[in-house]
Design a protein with these regions (language model features):
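Acidic, Ser/Thr/Pro
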Residues: 1-138
Length: 138
């Protein structure tokens, strides 16, 4: 079982169509599972914010915020783009860590460059943090 940890920054990269800096990983043919991890699991990030860490519009549990901390990310290979919405925005990094999204699996038929990135079509210059992904070949 092959495993790697990739840290995807939410910081701006104005040369990319996504507006943020993609991380490109060359993967061999096979089935892979992506897990969002945090710093306690060897990641470089716990969560990311698209609004300088501002929090607003949360429910009483600290979830479903209009602005907050999140784990949403996307990845693409060939003509495929997969957006993993995460679990929405949360009122704290701690709450976001407690509410990580479910694992995502995909299969590659050939050796392929896969790009991982966060999507912020608004203003990526006010982003903080990033998302850490563990990619495991099954």
């Amino acid at each position: 079982m092959l495993s790697s940890v990739d840290n995807v920054s939410s910081q701006p990269d104005f040369t990319s169509a996504e507006g943020t800096s993609p991380v490109t990983v060359k993967l061999q043919p096979g089935t892979y599972t992506i897990s969002v991890i945090d710093e306690s699991e060897g990641g470089g990030y716990n969560a990311w914010s698209r609004n300088n860490g501002k929090i607003s519009g949360c429910n009483n549990d600290g979830d479903d915020c209009a602005k907050g901390w999140e784990h949403g990310y996307a990845f693409e290979y060939g003509l495929e783009t997969k957006v993993v919405a995460g679990t929405g925005c949360h009122d704290s990094v701690k709450r976001a860590v407690e509410q990580k999204p479910v694992n995502k699996s995909f299969t590659l038929d050939d050796a392929t460059d896969v790009e991982f990135y966060v999507v912020d079509s608004g203003n990526p210059t006010n982003n903080l943090g990033g998302v850490s992904l563990r990619i495991v070949k099954e």
